[in-house]
A protein has these predicted regions:
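Beta-lactam-recognizing serine transpeptidase/beta-lactamase-like catalytic domain environment
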Residues: 107, 266, 271-317, 322-547, ...
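Periplasmic/cell-envelope proteins involved in peptidoglycan metabolism and beta-lactam response
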Residues: 1-293, 312, 386-398, 551-599
Length: 599
């Protein structure tokens, strides 16, 4: 009743009667009014729909903006601990292989797995810690349990696993133990050429992949190239010959053990190109399990220390040939010039003498074959400090070598603070200036190739060529003849390998004492050799640290009894591998023999 009273009439009588009096049709008027009202209703509904749609669009835009902002924040952040969800996208380029001069693999990549723990999924932390400690000797069960029950959500256990280790971990049956695929660096030859290759480790890491970075040796020197995707299919080729490297290391290790040496180094180099065919340092290490840096003791006692390019030693009488070669070049002497060998020489509170009495005088060639300190010192006095320094500098003895290894910068020669007459005389026979075995090999290569400087290299594709002329071909030829005489008539008779005409010079130098001066019971012995003398192709330098031959009643510590026989065995082993055919005609094609100078 109330609802009916409140209705508004669609056709009020007050409007109908006036309309009829005017002659209008009330039905048409009402129909038109209804049409207008319906259109107004539709327009209102359309406006309300548009408003609702706009609100929905604005709402979704706000939601997507918030999500995008959150994703951007997560992408740019660096979490304290890696998590699986944020690392799946880490993809690193494959590291290029390293091969020897014949294309044999020295370093490559191996697909493996890393082991990590998501602690929230651990069912039995104590049992898991115990089982892992049983599997890995370097893990402690209590330490693991403490980490498993801490607030950490993620924990690395092992960065790389062998298939056997992976299976053993899988057998534990713990859901919180997870495996992440990755590539690791593999050195298939173990410790062979370890000081050349150096080693690699992991840089940026994710649970699905890891970046391999070089930490030492060639791996570090050429790290950016090896990681460059454009080089990943092209291996880095070295000058090293794997077979020869193995032979050198085998003989060197045996000699080191037989002679009770503390360490050893050997370098085999082409005299015309500077290509290093073999470079060894002992003790060595396995780059697959590279040891940590030493925390105590001397750095050169560590197996990581490369004695061939980092070890700086007084190289003894091996230096004498440089003194004589310079004097010949300056025309101060000729091979037959008689040199006063009376001793001792007293200068500046120091006394210079020979190992044994060589008489009152010797010709220059015999100063070398008899290894006379007195004769060499007097020849050096003729040369003078300034010219001696210039000559040794031209041979590279005053700065680190340029070989392509990051460690080479550490092999900086130790020069005298004051290069006066006393230092000039002692340096002439290898005391007072310390250099690396690689310096010595480079200097002897210059003598062997006719007097031109060479640059030592480990890169097979390096553009090579002889450098500046340091000494004349005639002086180089005479120097080789004298070095051959050291083997046939002098202190290196054990180096006369049948068929290969070896030339060379021995060197024995006492080691500096921690209390000052020199320790007479400890020395460095070296032998620098060139072969074959009729067509010089290779130089071999062998250096032994604290070696001594104890086969007789008295220990023998000189190079003739230590470094020389080791060098001879290396030459006998590697010469056939180098393609050298022995000659047995006993003719020297140097063009000069000691008989030319003998009276």
């Amino acid at each position: 009743m109330t609802e009916a009273m409140n209705r508004v009439a669609i056709r009020p009588l007050s409007r109908i009667l006036p309309a009829r009096l005017r002659g209008d049709d009330p039905d048409k008027i009402e129909k038109e009014n209804l049409k207008i009202r319906h259109e107004q209703l539709r327009d209102g509904e359309r406006v309300r729909s548009n408003i609702r749609l706009l609100l929905i669009i604005v709402m979704f835009a706000c939601i997507y903006t918030a999500i995008g902002a959150r994703l951007a924040m997560l992408a740019s952040s660096q979490p304290a601990e890696p998590v699986a969800q944020s690392n799946n996208s880490l993809i690193f380029a494959r590291r290029a292989d390293i091969v020897d001069r014949r294309g044999r693999i020295l370093a490559t990549n191996l697909e493996t797995y890393a082991l990590y723990v998501e602690t929230r999924h651990l069912v039995d932390p104590r049992n898991t810690a115990n089982k892992l400690a049983d599997l890995f000797d370097d893990l402690n069960a209590n330490d693991l349990y403490s980490q498993f029950t801490s607030k950490r959500k993620f924990l690395w256990i092992k960065k790389k696993l062998s298939p056997e280790q992976m299976q053993a971990v899988h057998d534990i049956g713990e859901p919180g133990l997870r495996f992440g695929p990755r590539e690791t660096r593999l050195y298939p030859n173990g410790a062979l050429a370890s000081h050349i290759l150096g080693g690699a480790s992991f840089g940026k890491e994710g649970v699905k992949s890891a970046e391999i970075v070089g930490v030492a040796g060639i791996e570090k020197t050429f790290d950016s190239q090896l990681r460059d995707p454009s080089y990943s299919r092209k291996p880095l080729k070295l000058t090293i010959d794997l077979s020869i490297q193995a032979a050198v290391e085998h003989v060197l290790e045996g000699g080191m053990r037989l002679l009770n040496a503390k360490g050893a180094a050997a370098i085999l180099m082409e005299v015309d190109t500077g290509r290093v065919i073999s470079l060894a340092s002992l003790p060595d290490f396995d780059p697959n399990h590279r040891p940590g840096l030493p925390v105590r003791g001397s750095a050169d006692d560590s197996p990581l220390f490369n004695k061939a390019i980092q070890g700086v030693y007084e190289l003894g009488s091996t230096f004498k040939i440089f003194t004589v070669a310079q004097a010949l070049e300056l025309e101060l002497v000729d091979p037959k010039t008689k040199i006063n060998t009376k001793g001792p020489i007293r200068i500046g509170g120091h006394k210079i003498n020979d190992y044994r009495n060589n008489g009152p005088e010797l010709p220059v060639w015999q100063v070398i074959t008899e290894s006379s300190n007195l004769g060499t010192a007097r020849i050096a006095k003729m040369i003078g400090p300034e010219k001696q320094r210039e000559f040794l500098s031209s041979l590279g003895f005053t700065k680190p070598t340029s070989i392509e290894m990051i460690e080479a910068s550490g092999g900086k020669p130790l020069l005298p603070k004051r290069w006066n007459e006393l230092e000039t005389m002692t340096i002439s026979y290898g005391h007072g200036l310390s250099a690396t075995p690689l310096h010595l090999a480079t200097g002897y290569a210059t003598l062997a190739n006719g007097g031109r400087l060479v640059k030592p290299t480990l890169l097979e594709e390096e553009k090579l060529g002889l450098g500046q002329q340091i000494i004349s071909k005639e002086v180089a030829k005479n120097s080789l003849a004298m070095l051959r005489g050291v083997v046939t008539e002098g202190t290196a008779s054990l180096a006369d390998v049948n068929g290969y005409f070896v030339a060379g010079k021995t060197g024995t130098a006492d080691k500096p004492s921690a209390q000052g001066g020199y320790d007479k019971e400890k020395n460095i012995t070296s032998f620098a050799s060139i072969f074959p003398i009729h067509e010089p192709k290779y130089v071999l330098v062998v250096t032994l640290d604290e070696a001594q031959d104890t086969s007789g009643p008295e220990p023998k510590r000189t190079a003739g009894w230590t470094a020389v026989p080791v060098s001879a065995e290396i030459i006998a082993r590697v010469a056939p591998l180098l393609g050298l055919r022995p000659k047995f005609d006993n003719k020297s094609s140097v063009g000069v023999t000691l008989s030319n100078w003998q009276e």
